[in-house]
Amino acid sequence: VWRTKAKYDDSFSFTGIDFDKPYLLENIEVVKKITIHEKMDFWRKVMQLADDRGISMYIFHWNMFAYGAEGKHGITQDLSNETTIAYFRAATREMIKQYPLLKGIGITAGEGMDNKKTDDSNERWLWRSYGEGINDGLKDTPNRDFRLIHRFHWTALSKITDNFKDLHCRLDLSLKYAIAHMYSIPNPPFINDAFPMLSEKHKTWLTIRN
């Protein structure tokens, strides 16, 4: 586990790009040495503590970001890179298999994707990485209680349902009710335009940022 000694500046993008700036890695200290298996055991214990108390744990992803993996084994930030797609698919599969108490994952057609305005390339990428990865991970446990929560962000319901029609688990939607923080406006109007597009077939989570 590393921690940088460098001072953070205010040049970081709100899109989440370039958060692993080189200067941050030039002056680091090791906080703790821990193996990957010890890390996995730690999170299994956390999930067990949550499950014992009736708390369901989900992992949400803002896509796509390859921090820590970019530049290794041919992995890049390019949506068309088959190696990157295979990497995310395999990572999703193994996460599901290694954490049996994980109840689901959430995904976003978000800031790290460079084709927001073209066809359904974002959704196709999400399906080929996370969608196929979920199916792979549930192959040996098809009756497992697991769901995918797809954020209704920079996408459309038709693109989600078309691309994820072969998903082997429950598909829910998620919408940011207030877009910004919950106290920024007393009567958020943003959901009004989304209501007609939401489907009765899919549960929709209204999320609020505090």
Task: Place the predicted regions along the sequence by residue.
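Catalytic-core regions of glycoside hydrolase
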Residues: 1-4, 8-11, 36-40, 52, ...
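Acidic/aromatic-lined carbohydrate-recognition and catalytic surfaces
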Residues: 31-56
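Active-site-adjacent "subsite" loops/lids of carbohydrate-active enzymes
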Residues: 11-31, 56-93, 109
